[in-house]
Amino acid sequence: MMKHYIKGGNETKKGTKKQLPKPIIIIVNKVLPVIVLLVAGFFFIPYVSMNFQNNDVKGLNTKAEAVMFYNSICSHCQKVYPKIFWHNVLNFNNESKQIQTINVQNTNNKHYLADFAIQATPTFMKTTNINQRLVSTNSQQIKQFIQTRGH
């Protein structure tokens, strides 16, 4: 009895393991993890800042454009905080365009609720005119409020 082998059949050759092209290996091993970390950081960093910073504010920063009073467990605040965080990051070298953030959920900052009669969060307030306020999560309204001069 004679064995017949079909060319290109199921027989595998040892040592001829298929490998991805080198540029694809570099992308998968080096570039993709960096992209994943950057994307994760984009969402994670504001969350960390919202919950663990702004917990013991010594006073209003009168050089800042405005202040945002927020509560870290407030869903409306959670919606708007990342936008304010990245606004501050982009304006890190211009203190007059910063928006100071104060977490009024923290025991150390609860006095701001009474000091400035804060009734809802998030509340935006001009540092130059504490009577000029906005309670909103609408990006356009917030942007317009920030751009108006406090008198």
Show which residues each predicted segment covers:
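Thiol-based oxidoreductase modules, predominantly thioredoxin-like and allied folds used
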Residues: 69-71, 93-110
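Short acidic active-site motifs
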Residues: 56, 108-112, 141
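Local sequence-structure signature of Cys/Sec-based thiol-disulfide redox active-site neighborhoods
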Residues: 54-94
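N-terminal leader/targeting and pre-domain segments
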Residues: 2-62, 147-151
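Extracytoplasmic/secreted envelope proteins and their assembly/folding machinery
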Residues: 81, 85, 113, 139, ...
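Non-catalytic, surface beta->alpha helical segment in thiol-disulfide oxidoreductase systems
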Residues: 120, 125-151
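Extracytoplasmic/secreted cell-surface and envelope-processing proteins
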Residues: 77-78, 109-112, 133-136
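Short Fe-S-cluster ligation motifs
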Residues: 104-122
